[in-house]
């Protein structure tokens, strides 16, 4: 793992990973949440995001003319990669066509037939990435790859994106497990973050708060 990639992972673990009860865009719930925008919109985080995405793109020899994704999770990633590269343009995909002005859904770079990479911040169901891929192809772009910053590895997100992107590949820079593991390393050993997602107390079944020396809830942790 490159130095920039490790630093980006550490920043995600510190600034973007949260424990608690959260409702996901998929409609489900989770005991953790990853808000990548607190990292991708951070000054240092933006630099690292651009560098690490660009490293991955160059390693795969996609040679895109532009990079884009569905607003708004993709927005800071698009800008970061474009600025870092100095040669790759950016475009944003609206969730719906404008009802005034030009009425277009693709904003920014608009060269039909161009090689493009679709990006997103977090992939859960993959719906936003799929929307962007479909809109890009409908416009006339040649999608050569799809990427996300963090993949949650649930809700059939990867299969959905892979089907939509095919024959182009789908690449995630990190998994939620990677970020959670790094979060553990950066926190005290008795932090709730030590636990696997959904861990419960061995005595009463409530959400556990420690696994040292045993998995227990707040009431039974002593």
Where do the protein language model's features map onto the residues?
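PRPP-dependent phosphoribosyltransferase catalytic core
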Residues: 2-11, 134-197
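Phosphate/pyrophosphate-binding loops at sites that engage ATP/ADP/AMP, CoA/4′-phosphopantetheine
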Residues: 53-64, 133, 137-138
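Short, glycine/charge-rich flexible loops or terminal/linker lids adjacent to PRPP-binding catalytic cores
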Residues: 78-117, 125-131
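Short cysteine-rich clusters marking metal-coordination/redox-active sites
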Residues: 201-204, 217
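Cys/His-rich microdomains that often coordinate metals
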Residues: 208-209, 221-222
């Amino acid at each position: 793992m490159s130095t920039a990639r490790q630093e980006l992972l550490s920043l995600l673990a510190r600034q973007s990973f949260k424990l608690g009860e959260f409702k996901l865009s998929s409609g489900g719930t989770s005991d953790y949440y990853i808000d990548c925008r607190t990292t991708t919109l951070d000054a240092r985080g933006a630099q690292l995001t651009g560098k690490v995405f660009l490293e991955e793109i160059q390693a795969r020899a996609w040679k895109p003319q532009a990079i884009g994704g569905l607003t708004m999770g993709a927005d800071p990633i698009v800008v970061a990669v474009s600025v870092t590269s100095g040669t790759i343009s950016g475009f944003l995909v609206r969730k719906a066509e404008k009802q005034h002005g030009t009425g277009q859904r693709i904003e920014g770079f608009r060269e039909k037939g161009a090689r493009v990479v679709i990006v997103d911040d977090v992939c859960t169901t993959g719906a936003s990435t799929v929307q962007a891929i479909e809109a890009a192809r409908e416009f006339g772009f040649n999608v050569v790859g799809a990427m996300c910053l963090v993949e949650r590895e649930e809700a059939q997100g990867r299969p959905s994106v892979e089907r939509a992107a095919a024959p182009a590949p789908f690449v995630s820079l990190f998994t939620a497990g990677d970020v959670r593991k790094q979060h553990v390393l950066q926190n005290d050993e008795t932090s709730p973050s030590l636990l696997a997602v959904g861990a419960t107390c061995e005595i009463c079944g409530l959400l556990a708060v420690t696994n040292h020396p045993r998995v227990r809830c707040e009431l039974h942790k002593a």
